[in-house]
From Swiss-Prot:
<feature type="binding site">
    <location>
        <position position="413"/>
    </location>
    <ligand>
        <name>substrate</name>
    </ligand>
</feature>
<feature type="binding site">
    <location>
        <position position="186"/>
    </location>
    <ligand>
        <name>NAD(+)</name>
    </ligand>
</feature>
<dbReference type="GO" id="GO:0000105">
    <property type="term" value="P:L-histidine biosynthetic process"/>
</dbReference>
<feature type="binding site">
    <location>
        <position position="326"/>
    </location>
    <ligand>
        <name>substrate</name>
    </ligand>
</feature>
<dbReference type="InterPro" id="IPR012131">
    <property type="entry name" value="Hstdl_DH"/>
</dbReference>
<feature type="binding site">
    <location>
        <position position="256"/>
    </location>
    <ligand>
        <name>Zn(2+)</name>
    </ligand>
</feature>
<dbReference type="GO" id="GO:0004399">
    <property type="term" value="F:histidinol dehydrogenase activity"/>
</dbReference>
<dbReference type="GO" id="GO:0008270">
    <property type="term" value="F:zinc ion binding"/>
</dbReference>
<keyword id="KW-0368">Histidine biosynthesis</keyword>
<feature type="binding site">
    <location>
        <position position="256"/>
    </location>
    <ligand>
        <name>substrate</name>
    </ligand>
</feature>
<dbReference type="InterPro" id="IPR001692">
    <property type="entry name" value="Histidinol_DH_CS"/>
</dbReference>
<feature type="binding site">
    <location>
        <position position="419"/>
    </location>
    <ligand>
        <name>Zn(2+)</name>
    </ligand>
</feature>
<comment type="function">
    <text>Catalyzes the sequential NAD-dependent oxidations of L-histidinol to L-histidinaldehyde and then to L-histidine.</text>
</comment>
<comment type="pathway">
    <text>Amino-acid biosynthesis; L-histidine biosynthesis; L-histidine from 5-phospho-alpha-D-ribose 1-diphosphate: step 9/9.</text>
</comment>
<feature type="binding site">
    <location>
        <position position="419"/>
    </location>
    <ligand>
        <name>substrate</name>
    </ligand>
</feature>
<dbReference type="InterPro" id="IPR016161">
    <property type="entry name" value="Ald_DH/histidinol_DH"/>
</dbReference>
<keyword id="KW-0560">Oxidoreductase</keyword>
């Protein structure tokens, strides 16, 4: 059994509700484990970080946790460099259109405006674990640079006491200032509080395992750092009709399963025929492409689903309830169907837009809200690293004209003696 097919309607709560509630993981038990680690790094700095690096990453800690990128000259395959440079260019070009304008307006003779100012220091977490993610470095650093962040560092676990040149090259191409070789909750704590050797950051972004997420949530709750949306397992929801290629749909489901055993891969369709063909293609692919096979199979068996609804409208209703990290729309009228999307991290339209294009090269960001957080969070972007500062310049004439309203409002709130007076004396 690779992936199950369910013929459902929106009222089939016993089948759909557990899926909708997926990965809204209770972090309380993880927070209990993470809190003492974070506090220990806060109190003992580099010494604690060395102990946890050896314990959790199972490597001899590096002599220095910090690599200044300007001093590094990574040697990588020319093809990898070309791909990283191309990806960086596309990411940069797409994110440039997100840079907001400072605006102003005149209301009753008063000038009011918006000024966008960047966060000053940011850390971008690049996971270690089961894969290397130079693409995540590009996705995190480039929008921060465009926003005007002056101090950007990568935080990532060391591999055998050092880092692959591919990660260093990505950091250099993206424009980061330094790399901090520390992972997990201890790495997040180090860049949040700072240590003897590691500068602190005001804001931390990027995906990671549950310990990284718990550390970010804890430190954010303590007011130490700002964070992007809390990260959970990777996920894709595909809406497809009978115009979709079942082999391609199956490949897209499996590309998500390749991330990890807890990854979520769902197909919603109005075609039972497509559902059956996709199921066959998934099983066939698991046999033909055995690399990371156990991981993919467990992901598909535990978290993979094919839902056959009576019509596409119900597919979109379910998708908006699910609020997927990645949403693929492989339908005849995919451009029209885009208007039905309310909640999704990133949308991939048509048969030629697999998630992997956005993961690596097209230019959109792959640091996305998961576990239904797309209902309230957006993808990482330039605005993630900007603050909106409002300003006003009030005229004497406006003071005279608007004071009566200030008087009424301040008296109603019981604050006229000082609030009202501060306007009254300027008339």
């Amino acid at each position: 059994m690779a992936i199950q097919i369910f013929k459902v309607g929106l009222k089939d709560h016993s089948v759909l509700d557990p899926v909708l509630k997926r990965a809204r993981e209770d972090l309380s038990s993880t927070l209990a484990l993470v809190k003492p680690i974070v506090e220990d790094v806060k109190n003992r700095g580099d010494s604690a970080l060395r102990e946890y690096t050896q314990k959790f990453d199972e490597v001899i800690p590096p002599k220095s946790f910090v690599l200044e990128i300007s001093k590094l000259n990574p040697k990588i395959d020319p093809k990898l460099k070309t791909a990283l440079v191309k990806a960086a260019k596309n990411i940069r070009n797409f994110h440039k259109i997100q840079i907001p304008e400072n605006k102003e307006i005149i209301i009753h003779g008063n000038k009011l405006g918006i000024l966008h100012t960047p966060i000053e220091s940011v850390s971008v977490y690049a996971p270690g674990g089961k894969a290397l993610y130079p693409s995540t470095i590009l996705m995190g650093v480039i929008p921060a640079k465009l926003a005007g962040v002056k101090n950007i560092q990568i935080v990532t676990p060391p591999r055998k006491g050092t880092l692959p040149d591919g990660l260093i090259a990505a950091a250099k191409i993206a424009g980061a200032d330094r790399i901090v070789m520390a992972g997990g909750a201890q790495g997040i704590a180090a860049v949040s509080y700072g240590t003897e050797s590691i500068p602190s950051s005001e804001f931390v972004v990027g995906p990671g395992n549950k310990f990284v997420t718990a550390a970010k949530v804890y430190l954010s709750g303590q007011g130490v750092i700002g964070i992007d949306s809390p990260a959970g397992p990777s996920e894709v929801l595909i809406i497809a009709d009978d115009s979709a290629d079942p082999m391609w749909v199956a490949a897209d489901l499996l590309s998500q399963a390749e991330h990890g055993e807890d990854s979520v891969a769902i197909l919603c369709t109005n075609s039972l025929s497509l559902a059956q063909k996709v199921k066959e293609e998934v099983e066939k692919a698991l046999i033909e492409r055995p690399k990371r096979g156990e991981m993919k199979r467990k992901s598909i068996e535990d978290h993979g689903k094919i839902f056959v609804f009576s019509n596409l409208e119900e597919c979109f209703v379910f998708s908006n309830l699910f609020a997927p990290e990645h949403l693929e729309i492989q339908t005849k009228n995919f451009k029209k169907d885009l208007k039905k999307v309310k909640h999704a991290g990133s949308v991939f339209l048509g048969n030629y837009s697999p998630v992997a294009m956005g993961d690596y090269i097209s230019g959109t960001n792959h640091i996305l809200p998961t576990a239904g957080a797309a209902r309230i969070y957006s993808s990482l972007g330039v605005s993630t690293f900007l603050k909106r500062v409002t300003w006003q310049e009030v005229s004497k004439k406006s003071i005279q004209n608007l004071y009566p309203h200030v008087k009424v409002l301040s008296e109603f709130e019981g604050l006229d003696e000082e609030h009202g007076n501060s306007v009254r004396i300027r008339r």
